[in-house]
From Swiss-Prot:
HAMAP family: Lipoyl_synth. One of its GO terms (cellular component) is cytoplasm. It is found in: Cytoplasm. PROSITE patterns: RADICAL_SAM. GO terms for molecular function: 4 iron, 4 sulfur cluster binding; lipoate synthase activity; metal ion binding. The keyword Secreted does not apply. This is Lipoyl synthase. Keywords: 4Fe-4S, Cytoplasm, Iron, Iron-sulfur, Metal-binding, S-adenosyl-L-methionine, Transferase. Residues 64-278 form the Radical SAM core domain. CDD domains: Radical_SAM (cd01335). Pfam families: Radical_SAM.
Length: 306
């Protein structure tokens, strides 16, 4: 499978909720600018996957032009079917044992100063894919020591052993997205559990790692829901936060319930800072990897040391 194969970009597919002017931005497949060509060639030549493509991220052009990308490990088939997500659901293939090496070589070749690693849920694996994350981190440190590493992880079913495997590799930032408010979990992401995700985040923070999470709006949440979610995240050790607008990936996905106005995202950013979060990215097109390198360097003084 060619991970760079063209696919329809995210758009509003709910006719009852018109696409507002502030969401009408160009999100077409990238053209062949020099920076885009470099990233595309790297990913394609090493047979890698990026979440930029697999999840139809609206910031693909912007990030690839900056020579940044989020690598998606462990294949492109997920064992969970979340209603908001564009990653394919099904039975995954066995892990590719050479993938960590290829990712590390790609990071080295691109000269990245900050890399984000994520993965599909691999509930078919005993450790949920934690060892695969750890090996990739270790390989990157071997080939490109100056690159800082952020991981965006599944919940690993809150397994202590899986989390410890990840910790041993010493990534700089560990992100686990809460995604939505507690009341919507049964509908939006029934194979996940709100309190379990909070437990995972607290576990990460308690082990000294800079802890990050994110929420998407427009799924039917109330302001009270969002405020409580932010309070919960902070209480469980999260200090880096992203807040973005949900975009319906396809006709079978959960429909957009509302488009949150830009000034409301500003309000939530101000609220989050008042709660105590250290860095907050909040806006209609913000995603969990949005300007991750810049936010990392803002917070580098509180990262764990080797």
């Amino acid at each position: 499978m060619n991970p760079l194969k063209k696919k329809p970009r995210s758009k509003n597919l709910n006719p009852t909720v018109p696409l507002p002017d502030w969401m009408k931005v160009r999100v077409s497949f990238p053209t062949d600018s020099d920076a885009l060509s470099v990233v595309r060639a790297e990913v394609e030549s090493k047979e890698l996957h990026t979440v930029c493509e697999s999840a139809s991220c609206p910031n693909l052009n912007h990030c690839w032009n900056r020579k940044t990308a989020t690598y998606m490990l462990a294949g492109d088939i997920c064992t969970r079917r979340c209603q908001y997500c564009d990653v394919a659901f099904g039975k995954p293939k066995p892990l590719d044992s050479l993938e960590p090496e290829r990712v590390a070589r790609s990071v080295q070749s691109l000269g990245l100063r900050h890399v984000v690693l994520t993965a599909v849920n691999r509930d078919d694996l005993k450790d949920g894919g934690a060892s695969h994350f750890a090996e990739t981190i270790t390989k990157i440190k071997t080939y490109h020591k100056d690159c800082t590493i952020e991981v965006l992880i599944p919940d690993f079913k809150a397994k202590e052993d899986s989390l410890q495997i990840l910790y041993a590799a010493k990534p700089n930032i560990i992100n686990h997205n809460i995604e939505t408010v507690e009341s919507l979990f049964p509908t939006i992401t029934p194979q996940k559990n709100y309190k379990r995700s909070l437990e995972v985040l607290a576990h990460i923070a308690n082990h000294g790692f800079l802890t990050k999470s994110g929420i998407i709006l427009g799924l039917g949440e109330t302001d009270e829901d969002v405020n409580q979610c932010l309070m919960d995240l902070f209480a469980h050790g999260v200090r880096m936060l992203t807040i973005g607008q949900y975009l319906q990936p396809g006709p079978t996905h959960y429909p957009v319930q509302s488009f949150v106005r830009p000034e409301t995202f500003v309000m939530w950013k101000e609220t989050a800072y008042k709660i105590g979060f250290k860095t907050v990215a909040s806006g209609p097109l913000v995603r969990s990897s949005y300007h991750a390198d810049e936010y990392f360097h803002e917070e580098s003084q509180i990262l764990p040391t080797e």
